[in-house]
């Protein structure tokens, strides 16, 4: 049994989330590109560049086949991604296998012949068609993203949920607009007709990611320290909050843009099981329903992009995807909770960890041991 002295929670980069599903990439240097989501180029131990076809992406919302009761391929319980359901037995039951490194993999179905216990530890991921903001850093009080960008929380939320625009670039000859200005949908439409092509205003999680990635943290830290010398008491409190977040990012290896996600981790299937009941019905955890919503909306958005759908339609679908990810991470913090029958709110990842009945206090802490 492994012993842990402490646990540290940080922000996971897209590369780290992808490496959880691809152990060959752990500890390796590579860059994940959402546009080329199927392949990555990494640097091996000898310093050579190698290309790897990624595995572990959950593409379908299906769980189990209703006829065979076996996991659907590329679904939420896929044996290729998460490992076999029975010890040393692949999905097709054939004995044909080939050696891939240290692993035994069936040539026909691609399932690794190993212990079924790996289904408790192997992770998958969902590659998102559009970035989404992590709700912990947006909605929790105080909002880390709002403080870091020196904006009001309401303004950031309106941009994330595509209700407002923020001016990114503007020509010098336009006096009515300035970078960082918040515009409503109607105002942006008016200015677009008046100054078409002479300014740039964007919305959505992509905009927040762009703003966060362009922050010069060292420069911001120096500016805040200078401002603190002459600031009033009320202003000082606000500046100190911002300084603490900036210093925390500089001291850690985390980057501000990681608060906007291109990839979502899918936890192992044995931690969100489906149980067969009498009469052929299944009982399942709420997490599977929350993941299913994300995959459905993500697939629909990807198809809309491929078809070249109008901006109005894709914007609405992006908002639905953001709301689906919010519900998965923290359903209780949302104004309109995602619920099932009898209006029971679905239990999100945060709800599983939080409170007296949460995983930490109920299962891990305060236990008598021999």
Annotate each language-model stretch with its function.
Residues 1-370:
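Conserved core architecture of multi-subunit DNA-directed RNA polymerases
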């Amino acid at each position: 049994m492994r012993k842990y002295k402490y646990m540290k929670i940080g922000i996971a980069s897209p590369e780290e989330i992808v490496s959880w599903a691809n152990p060959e990439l752990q500890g390796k240097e590579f860059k994940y590109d959402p546009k080329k989501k199927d392949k990555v180029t990494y640097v091996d131990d000898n310093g050579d560049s190698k290309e790897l076809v990624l595995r572990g992406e959950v593409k379908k919302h299906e769980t189990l086949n209703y006829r065979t009761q076996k996991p659907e391929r590329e679904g939420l319980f896929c044996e290729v991604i998460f490992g076999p359901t029975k010890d040393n037995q692949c999905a097709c039951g054939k004995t044909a296998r080939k050696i891939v490194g240290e692993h035994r993999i069936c040539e026909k179905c691609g399932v690794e012949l190993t212990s079924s216990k790996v289904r408790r530890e192997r992770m998958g991921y969902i590659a998102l068609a559009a970035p989404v903001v992590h709700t912990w850093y947006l909605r929790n009080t105080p909002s880390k993203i709002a403080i870091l960008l020196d904006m009001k929380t309401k303004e950031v939320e309106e941009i994330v949920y595509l209700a407002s625009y923020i001016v990114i670039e503007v020509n010098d000859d336009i006096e009515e607009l300035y970078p960082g200005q918040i515009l409503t949908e109607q105002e942006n439409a008016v200015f677009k007709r008046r100054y078409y092509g002479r300014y740039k205003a964007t919305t959505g999680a992509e905009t927040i990611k762009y703003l966060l990635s362009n922050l010069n943290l060292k420069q911001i830290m120096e500016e805040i320290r200078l401002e603190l010398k002459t600031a009033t008491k009320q202003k000082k409190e606000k500046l100190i909050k911002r300084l603490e977040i900036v210093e925390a990012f500089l001291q850690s290896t985390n980057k501000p843009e990681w608060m906007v996600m291109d990839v979502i981790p899918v936890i192992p299937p044995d931690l969100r099981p489906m149980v067969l009941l009498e009469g052929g019905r299944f009982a399942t955890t709420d997490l599977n329903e929350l993941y299913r919503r994300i995959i459905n909306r993500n697939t629909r958005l990807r198809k809309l992009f491929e078809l070249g759908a109008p901006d109005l339609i894709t914007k609405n679908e992006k908002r639905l995807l953001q709301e689906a990810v919010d519900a998965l991470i923290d359903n209780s913090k949302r104004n309109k909770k995602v619920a099932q029958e009898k209006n029971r709110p679905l239990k999100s990842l945060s709800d599983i960890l939080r409170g007296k009945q949460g995983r930490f206090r109920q299962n891990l802490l305060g236990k008598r041991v021999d």
